[in-house]
Design a protein with these regions (language model features):
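Short hydrophobic/aromatic, small-residue-rich stretches within specific transmembrane helices
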Residues: 56-63, 268-272
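Hydrophobic core of transmembrane alpha-helices in multi-pass small-molecule transporters
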Residues: 27, 109-127, 236, 319-336
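Short amphipathic helix-loop junctions that connect adjacent transmembrane helices
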Residues: 39-53, 247-262
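Hydrophobic alpha-helical transmembrane segments
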Residues: 111-122, 144-202, 269, 321-324, ...
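C-terminal transmembrane bundle of multi-pass solute transporters/carriers
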Residues: 3, 67-71, 75, 79, ...
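Small-residue hotspots at the loop-to-helix junctions and early N-terminal turns
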Residues: 36, 49-56, 150, 261-268, ...
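Juxtamembrane intracellular "pre-TM" segments in multi-pass secondary transporters
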Residues: 2-20, 199-233, 421
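Pair of pore-lining "gating" transmembrane helices in MFS-fold secondary transporters
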Residues: 10-42, 46, 119, 223-244, ...
Length: 421
């Protein structure tokens, strides 16, 4: 373990200025994102008194853009400079976020306003995420894709660990809408860090093909790649279930268990400790299991352990411990899974197709999330939060088991290059 951690911090990527700027910016943005996500839930639940169904709609709007423009965004990004796309998306996020505290100060904040901002942030996220995932192979080289993704995933986990706790503390001091100011400041730093990247970016490939033709080419590539398409289907199913779980957990904690927003933030923060450990130890799992079995094993364990969380309603005295421990274990395994499957996709995809491939997978993940969010809100209203959580966790476990039947699950080594047809 000590050797793994030491090697992680002394990797050649730490001498790559472009990657370090991207990494620093992403770390700040992830902290802000987590604070903003918690603040959004607190505003909807505590300030605007939204119902379970309205909360589901609000969560759905945050990812609706992936369903609407997810596929064309990939084709567009393939023809644009990725760094410029990320900067413009960051500036747009800042403007949208600042509107919330301004509306609150002038007593004009409504649920409709919050929903519009959620939708705009989702649109910015579409373009930023597609560009950022396509930018990593440009600045990190294919040799270090897995290491780069591991560090960026660690940034996500640092944000997930520190963001909710910081957000919960801030919610105890300020009104939820004012906490959005911190999120805006983190995006200011993130945008500045990306702007500081000086590494020349290759000119994007431009073709005379129409947008529809480019989208079809991307879809045909994913559909015809024997490793990608089965993985695509399983990831889409898992994302639907995960979106439902993410909507239901805050309701379980804040309403069913009657905890405070501060307690919710701390519980989410503790859970992310497992994610940081997962990013640090992923290479050991890869050496022992290979790519395929690492994806399957970590995915199944990571979602199955979440079944402990709804049982917390039957043990109020131990509820916080149950949610925290299951969150740590789940985050550990799902971080290893996420980094491994993302690195596999980037490794086997040709450079001119990265934007479209990433957009198609983002479409699969984020595009179905509005449906999962909405379905979970309706399910909770009909059968109760606890029962709804069991249903969505079972769906996630089923999707993970299905991954074991895909060709990707049979990759035994630590690289997929020799398996590309």
């Amino acid at each position: 373990m000590a050797v793994t951690v030491r090697a992680w911090f002394h990797h050649p990527l730490t001498r790559n200025s472009a990657f370090m700027h991207l990494w620093a910016g992403q770390t700040a943005a992830q902290v802000g994102f987590q604070v903003g996500t918690l603040a959004t839930s607190a505003i909807a639940i505590s300030v605007l008194r939204a119902s379970e169904t309205q909360i589901g709609v609000l969560s759905a709007l945050q990812t609706l853009a992936f369903l609407i423009v997810g596929l064309p965004a990939g084709a567009w990004v393939d023809g644009w400079r990725k760094r410029r796309v990320m900067i413009i998306a960051g500036l747009a996020r800042i403007g949208a976020l600042i509107s919330i505290p301004l509306a609150y100060v002038f007593a004009t904040l409504t649920l409709t306003h919050l929903m519009i901002v959620a939708a705009l942030l989702g649109l910015c996220t579409v373009f930023f995420d597609v560009a950022y995932q396509s930018y990593v192979p440009i600045i990190a080289s294919r040799r270090y894709i897995g290491a780069a993704n591991g560090r960026l995933e660690a940034s996500y986990q640092v944000g997930h660990a520190g963001g909710p706790g910081l957000g919960g503390w801030l919610l105890g001091l300020f009104a939820p809408p004012l906490v959005y100011l911190l999120t805006a400041l983190t995006y200011v730093f993130s945008t500045w860090a990306i702007w500081r990247i000086a590494t020349p970016e290759p000119a994007p490939t431009r073709t005379g093909a129409t947008l529809v033709a480019q989208i079809r080419e991307g879809l045909a590539f994913v559909r015809g790649q024997r490793l990608l398409f089965p993985l695509f289907s399983c990831i889409a199913a898992a994302a639907f279930a995960a979106a439902g779980i993410q909507v239901l957990l805050p309701i379980l904690v804040l309403r069913t268990l009657d905890m405070s927003a501060t307690q919710l933030g701390l519980l989410l923060s503790v859970g992310a400790i497992g994610g940081i450990l997962g990013a640090l130890t992923r290479s050991a799992w890869m050496k022992h299991l290979g790519i395929g079995r690492t994806i399957v094993v970590t995915s199944i364990i990571g979602v199955a352990v979440l079944a402990a969380q709804p049982t917390a309603v039957h043990a109020p005295a131990a509820a916080a411990a149950i949610i925290a421990v299951s969150g740590i274990v789940s985050s550990y395994f799902l971080t290893i899974y996420n980094v491994t499957q993302m690195s596999l996709r980037q490794e086997i995809c040709p450079p001119h197709m990265l934007g479209r491939m990433n957009a198609i997978f983002r479409f699969a993940v984020w595009g179905v999330m509005p449906l999962g969010s909405l379905a979970s809100g309706v399910a909770a209203s009909w059968m109760g939060v606890e029962a709804a959580m069991y249903v969505f966790i079972a769906l996630a476990v089923g999707a993970s088991i299905a991954m074991g039947l895909t060709p990707a699950a049979r990759i035994r080594g630590t690289s997929a290059i020799n398996t590309i047809p």
